[in-house]
Amino acid sequence: MLSLSKNWNALIKTDKVSYESFHETNNKSKIIVEPLERGFGLTLGNAMRRVLLSSLQGAAVTSIKIPGIEHEFSSIPGVKEDISEIILNVKGIEIKMHVAEKRVIRLKATGPGAITAGMIEAGHDVEILNPDHVICNLAKNKQFEMELTCKVGKGYTLSTNNNEDNNLPIGEIAIDALFNPVKSVTYKVENTRIGQVTDYDKLIMFVETNGDILPEMAVGLAARILQEQLQLFISFEEQEEDKQVKTDALPFSPYLLKRVDELELSVRSANCLKNDNIIYIGDLVKRTEADMLRTPNFGRKSLNEIKEILAKFSLRFGMDVPDWPPENIHELSKRYEDSYN
């Protein structure tokens, strides 16, 4: 019977996920995943983007209360913006909550000038992430007060959903709330190569958050959500031989058991390794670059070719491999074949 695990172990795997921050606050990151099977860049990129933009927990202002104001169609003398504009500006306040329960924070200010989110008395449980965000503009000597109710939630909710059973007190105005800490997600898929095969996928994602969590954490949470949802579809038990490969621990990466003649090297590089009796990747990575360059007919071009391939497996020249070579290397290579093919 065909091993069930071949369905997933036969696919190329990567342990290489790189994160590159390109903003001084670390709120923007470039995430690169490679190599992936053809088509998986688009599959994973689209799924991750949808989850990142819809399903993460965050905090937001869900209602406001301004003395003397009963609804959003009002205006306040001495305040440049009407209530509808103030509500739009309040929706742009980005917050982080350190507790799960709702909190009420307060704003008291006197004109003239712009009133910003940083003037809010947030206390210890709520943190304002964009303190320079303008809420309204006041005339000279104009006093302005407002209470803001903050809650933890998911995604985007309308004001009608934030009015708990229509039980908000008179004068408290429910507003739309964007809880999601992820502000934007874009991705693109490029070709990458392993040896002579050039049509593997490279997934490049650009993720920006509001500072509540780092992009790396957001990506991890999105992947965990997908994992939890997809688990429902796994309705079979793994075969014993599949479990055996998983539970028998190796003191080194199973990739080291892969034969070098399976790497699709150039003819020159492959012949040099064969003539030097280098059979497995484990034999190869124990050599230093200097050792390799002393190999007859092996030049810098061949060295760079092999270094690039090893990097795909998170390997390099000059590695210290414990217990290499194992006595039963041929048997182990067969047993772990699904792990690296």
Curated annotation (Swiss-Prot):
Instruction: Map out region (Alpha N-terminal domain (alpha-NTD)) in residue numbers.
Output: 1-237
E.C. number, please? Answer: 2.7.7.6
GO BP: any one term: DNA-templated transcription
According to the UniProt entry, the note on domains is: The N-terminal domain is essential for RNAP assembly and basal transcription, whereas the C-terminal domain is involved in interaction with transcriptional regulators and with upstream promoter elements.
In Swiss-Prot or TrEMBL terms, this protein is called DNA-directed RNA polymerase subunit alpha
Gene Ontology MF: a single term: DNA binding
Which InterPro entries has this protein been placed in? Answer: DNA-dir_RNA_pol_insert, DNA-dir_RNA_pol_RpoA/D/Rpb3, DNA-dir_RpoA, RBP11-like, RNAP_asu_C, RNApol_insert_sf
Keywords, A to Z? Answer: DNA-directed RNA polymerase, Nucleotidyltransferase, Transcription, Transferase
Record's GO cellular component terms: cytoplasm; DNA-directed RNA polymerase complex
Listed under catalytic activity are: RNA(n) + a ribonucleoside 5'-triphosphate = RNA(n+1) + diphosphate
Q: How the protein assembles, per its UniProt entry?
A: Homodimer. The RNAP catalytic core consists of 2 alpha, 1 beta, 1 beta' and 1 omega subunit. When a sigma factor is associated with the core the holoenzyme is formed, which can initiate transcription.
Q: Which organism is it from?
A: Rickettsia bellii (strain OSU 85-389)
UniProt xrefs under Pfam families: RNA_pol_A_bac (PF01000), RNA_pol_A_CTD (PF03118), RNA_pol_L (PF01193)
NCBIfam families for this protein: PRK05182.1-2, PRK05182.2-5, rpoA
Entry function: DNA-dependent RNA polymerase catalyzes the transcription of DNA into RNA using the four ribonucleoside triphosphates as substrates.
Question: Known CDD domains for this protein?
Answer: RNAP_alpha_NTD
Q: Which family does it belong to?
A: Belongs to the RNA polymerase alpha chain family.
Q: What are the start and end residues of every segment in region (Alpha C-terminal domain (alpha-CTD))?
A: 252-341
Give the enzyme's main class according to its UniProt record, as a single word: transferase
